[in-house]
A protein has these predicted regions:
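Structural/interface elements that position substrates and couple domains in central-metabolism enzymes
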Residues: 1-372
């Protein structure tokens, strides 16, 4: 069952996070529905990313209440938690079957049953199943795992600005640092965070700390990372103005609207914020994405034919999603055939050879590269 878990964020005019709230209503309703229809000895495994404490403080009491209401024993069911680590894109199935899993249960019997089930779908010959002591631990593990990545991304934002001010190539700098094993996952610059995980998961932990555990402490750094990441599109927009000047009433082309490369998914894509900023100064905007023909959140058509959008006179072409299609030789050659224009690579998609080639004809800028 796929269940929505909503986080409502509130921001000021600077896109700084000012507050948030987590609604568990739809999740609780779905759990109640399960309890009204499941067997007495059911195994329930929660894979959804949930606020720590959810299995014990929400799922468990609801299931037991519904079973008792039906006149069934409420001590025979089993409840486990094993969060998914799916990676959208061409390797989606492999990211489920051939990736390590963490799991737990509300008791040892539930944990054993969860392990037995996971062994039927996970290739344990190459992937470890790591058992934690209880569901609080696995729930924390998931939001900590994603908060770490969100913070890593937000960390690089201010260094992108510094690199541009210092006429430095942050990509080369990061590559050099990555040679050190302890720093091998340092992130590259980019337009921002999108999708249905990193945009909210740190907030689930912050909410849970108060709502489920009555804590007086705060996860300030994790919450701050969400606020910083939400502001990344504005930074990219301001940099575009610095480099290319005022583009009021200019023709702008976005290449890519998905939140992730080689995926047709626009949920919480950072491109949406950048699009809104650009739309405020010009209505002459074209959109292209090889995986999407309609942008639901913006209620607008998206072109899938690259030649159609390139045939129009474009004042600025924004590389906004890391689709491999855009760095193919065929696409580069098409870009070389159009009239001289401005190209803004917000994600560091092009390699040095491609940058050199495109720069022979176009005015090219790359986010995080002050050397060009």
């Amino acid at each position: 069952i796929d269940i929505n878990l909503d986080v409502e964020k509130k921001s000021n005019s600077k896109d700084e996070l000012t507050g948030f709230d987590v609604s568990m209503d739809s999740f609780a309703k779905a759990v109640s529905e399960i309890g009204r229809n499941c067997k007495e000895e059911v195994l329930i495994i929660v894979e959804t990313t949930v606020p720590p404490g959810t299995c014990k403080k929400l799922v468990k009491p609801i299931i037991e209440e519904e079973l008792a209401r039906r006149g069934l024993q409420n001590n025979k069911y089993k409840l486990g938690h094993s969060y998914e680590r799916v990676m959208p894109g061409p390797n989606y199935i492999n990211s489920i079957r051939e990736y390590p899993r963490v799991y737990s249960g509300i008791d040892s019997q539930s944990a054993d049953a969860t392990e037995a089930f996971l062994k039927t779908i996970i290739n344990t010959s190459i992937c470890n199943l790591t058992r934690l002591n209880n569901t609080n631990e696995t729930e924390i593990a998931k939001v900590l795992e994603n908060s770490y990545r969100a913070m890593n991304i937000s960390f690089i934002v201010e260094w992108s600005r510094f690199a541009e001010e210092a006429d430095a190539n942050l990509y080369s700098i990061v590559n050099a640092i990555r040679e050190r094993e302890t720093h091998s996952n340092l992130m590259y610059p980019g337009i921002g965070v999108g999708g249905y995980c990193l945009t909210k998961d740190p907030l689930l932990a912050s909410w849970s700390q108060k709502a489920h555990f009555d804590s007086k402490n705060d996860l300030n750094m994790s919450t701050k990372s969400v606020s910083i990441n939400d502001q990344m599109p504005k930074f990219a927009y301001r940099r575009m103005i610095e480099v290319f000047g005022n583009f009021e009433d200019k023709n702008i082309l976005f290449l890519g609207i998905s939140y992730r490369g080689d995926v047709g998914d626009t949920r919480f894509t950072p491109v949406s914020s950048l699009y809104d900023y650009v739309k405020a100064v010009t209505k002459k905007i074209s959109l292209h994405d090889p995986y999407i023909n309609y942008w639901e959140e913006q209620d607008i058509k998206v072109e899938q034919d690259i030649e159609t959008v390139l045939s129009r006179s474009q004042d600025i072409i924004i590389i906004s999603t890391g689709h491999s299609f855009y760095k193919k030789d065929e696409t580069i050659n098409k870009l070389m055939k159009i009239q001289s224009t401005n190209i803004y690579d917000t994600i560091g998609l092009f390699n040095n050879d491609q940058i050199a080639k495109l720069s022979q004809k176009h005015n090219l800028s790359v986010l995080g590269r002050g050397d060009i």
